[in-house]
Amino acid sequence: MGRHIVCITFDFDAISGWIARGMTTPGPISRGEFGPNVALPRILALLRKYDVPASWFIPGHTLETYPEQCRQVCAAGHEIGHHGWTHRPPASLSREQEEDELTRTNEQIIKLTGRGARGYRSPAWDLSPHSVDLLLQHGFVYDSSMMGDDYTPYRVRRGDIIELEKPAVFGRQTRLIEMPISWSLDDFPHFEF
């Protein structure tokens, strides 16, 4: 049988996505605990069985809260990507807060893997006006937060001007590569709601 190339990614949010929304009661937290305690071992076993590498985008809060599970992901040879600190949307942060989250999470990734993340996925699948500059400044090679294609990588633009009553003016392409995503290919909306 011939080889096939696939790109499999996981957003290993655990409880961080609920904390970011102020949902710290037992119900939401228990939904966040399912990932590290139930889903992660099953997923790692499946990936190991079929010898499939994957990229895991992990918030810094998850790296600190579930260090053993994150070590298991890393030990299995999977890529560890950056996914914010506590899953707060970058557009809701100041430039300084966004940079602090980039730095703080990357420090945890370096502790786990020995090097900074090459890939970034925004917790909200959206970027702030500062995100592209910060990602380039901090040495990221690719982003995986946007949906401008179904599966073909493309270069991220910087400097778009989008106004309600005027035609869009698109900025210049950067060296940052976009690995597009799609809500229709993500399991969260199907299983959570």
Whereabouts are the PLM-identified features?
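Active-site beta->alpha N-cap acidic-glycine motif
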Residues: 1-76
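Short, well-ordered coil/turn segments that N-cap beta-strands
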Residues: 2-6, 50-54, 75-79, 113-118, ...
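Active-site flanking residues adjacent to catalytic metal/cofactor-binding acidic residues
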Residues: 8-10, 82, 142-144
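Conserved, mostly hydrophobic/aromatic
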Residues: 11, 47, 56, 80-83, ...
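Active-site beta-loop-alpha junctions enriched in small/polar residues
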Residues: 11-15, 59-61, 85-87, 122-125, ...
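Acidic-and-aromatic substrate-binding clefts and catalytic sites of carbohydrate-active enzymes
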Residues: 32-37, 55-67, 88-98, 121-129, ...
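An active-site-proximal "capping" alpha-helix that borders the catalytic cofactor pocket
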Residues: 100-109
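Active-site-adjacent pocket scaffolds in enzyme catalytic domains
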Residues: 110-111, 115-193
